[in-house]
Amino acid sequence: MAFSKLLEQAGGVGLFQTLQVLTFILPCLMIPSQMLLENFSAAIPGHRCWTHMLDNGSAVSTNMTPKALLTISIPPGPNQGPHQCRRFRQPQWQLLDPNATATSWSEADTEPCVDGWVYDRSVFTSTIVAKWDLVCSSQGLKPLSQSIFMSGILVGSFIWGLLSYRFGRKPMLSWCCLQLAVAGTSTIFAPTFVIYCGLRFVAAFGMAGIFLSSLTLMVEWTTTSRRAVTMTVVGCAFSAGQAALGGLAFALRDWRTLQLAASVPFFAISLISWWLPESARWLIIKGKPDQALQELRKVARINGHKEAKNLTIEVLMSSVKEEVASAKEPRSVLDLFCVPVLRWRSCAMLVVNFSLLISYYGLVFDLQSLGRDIFLLQALFGAVDFLGRATTALLLSFLGRRTIQAGSQAMAGLAILANMLVPQDLQTLRVVFAVLGKGCFGISLTCLTIYKAELFPTPVRMTADGILHTVGRLGAMMGPLILMSRQALPLLPPLLYGVISIASSLVVLFFLPETQGLPLPDTIQDLESQKSTAAQGNRQEAVTVESTSL
């Protein structure tokens, strides 16, 4: 716990922490545009088969209306509109008869869209669906693109967690911003869908490093009393980015322009990130006290605290001798499951991360199916997410981490299950429940960011965060895939999302400790001390209750 006292000597909360938060707000505003980009860049426009009589101008009869030509060229689809995936082999002139019925033609009279499709460009001038014809028999390639993107975050979460502990938080953050910028910009030049997916994977790989490095740097430079507020502010920036995406996509209807707008800012963010100091906690753990002292003095100078000039290497080493000793002990992924005090919380957090992201991404990637203006709906989702996260700091001050985490996940699950009972024609009420669930997920994700950092000590914090992100991204990959079962079992996806969310809230209640008001643990011994203190407190409370009753 000694580093917490050293951080207080460097000012605790001041100008540096404010500038740091403002710096991290920039990527948090832009990351949602990358993650949720395909709600718009891969939106499915209205489409039908290309036909000679309708779309070959020289073959169109001048005495027939476009509606009549459509009637004899395209069969009706399931929703009574023009079929999106089939056309008549030959013009069905008999359908012009007002008395014609569905029996006037048969399936044998139709064929697939062998000459391609005609797309409605009234909403989007261009999408990747229209560019590579990801419709009809190829419609499964659209969710594949999102799954590949999520797999990039999955792999990156594991790799960057290990690399950040080995090489430091700061260089990984700058590199990942540059990687995302280059890969994201390059996608507009992709000649094939395969190359596009590969570049999206590389961009997502870098995004995972931005998540891990930025959040860890922020947590490790923030005092215990301000940690919840700081993380909530950053979470609100993420929500604002979601809302802004709706406006950005409304203004930029071409997928290439939208992709550039979401990628180019990361070039600037990569340069800006170099002013940030390296984590002094990490430098201490890695046996680099001289550099740690320099960073602490730098922060103190920015905060205007002259007392830190008296901080010497001897005082630093004396204060953090437990951390230095801990750094000499070999740590690996196995420590999360072999060390008794870490085992239960590691397993429980794996379950919580996995289940939370299954339900969350199943909801946010299903935007177009709500049947409303997706630009407005995206902005609405971001706004309610902002409100949910903004209230998190206040809620955490009174109710604690465990209560908020469990309660918000349970409420989100109940909102999803309630939506199952609402008829399809009551779209407004369905949107209300969806927005309520999104807001609860916003609270849950903000709380989880703080909670998991407080559950693990410094030597394994990045490794744990990397593993949790990896498992969470497995859930994120599963969320959209579950939606594919809707064609056979329409109620299965929301049922799974709701039940999984409620079940994970019970895991939080029964298997995770409360960390409210506790200093950030620097060693495994700190966790043991917290556990012993909590046990003594429980025994004392039991004695007090018994004495009162007597």
Curated annotation (Swiss-Prot):
GO molecular function, one term: prostaglandin transmembrane transporter activity
Segments of this protein annotated with the region Disordered: 531-550
Biological process per Gene Ontology, one example term: organic anion transport
Keyword Ribosomal protein among record annotations: no
Subcellular location: Cell membrane; Apical cell membrane; Basal cell membrane
InterPro entries cross-referenced by the UniProt entry: MFS_dom (IPR020846), MFS_sugar_transport-like (IPR005828), MFS_trans_sf (IPR036259)
Bilayer-crossing regions: 11-31, 143-163, 175-195, 201-221, 232-252, 257-277, 347-367, 379-399, 403-423, 431-451, 464-484, 491-511
Membrane topology: Multi-pass membrane protein
GO CC term (a single one): apical plasma membrane
Keywords of this entry: Anion exchange, Antiport, Cell membrane, Glycoprotein, Ion transport, Membrane, Transmembrane, Transmembrane helix, Transport
Regions of this protein lying in the Extracellular compartment: 32-142, 196-200, 253-256, 368-378, 424-430, 485-490
Topological domain ranges for the Cytoplasmic compartment: 1-10, 164-174, 222-231, 278-346, 400-402, 452-463, 512-550
SUPFAM superfamilies in UniProt: MFS general substrate transporter
Sugar-modified residues: N39, N56, N99
Post-translational modifications reported in the UniProt record: N-glycosylated. Contains several complex-type N-glycans.
Effect of H52A: Slightly reduced estrone 3-sulfate transport. Reduced cell surface expression and estrone 3-sulfate transport
Function according to Swiss-Prot or TrEMBL: Antiporter that mediates the transport of conjugated steroids and other specific organic anions at the basal membrane of syncytiotrophoblast and at the apical membrane of proximal tubule epithelial cells, in exchange for anionic compounds. May be responsible for placental absorption of fetal-derived steroid sulfates such as estrone sulfate (E1S) and the steroid hormone precursor dehydroepiandrosterone sulfate (DHEA-S), as well as clearing waste products and xenobiotics from the fetus. Maybe also be involved in placental urate homeostasis.
Name listed for the protein in its UniProt record: Solute carrier family 22 member 11
Gene name of the record: SLC22A11
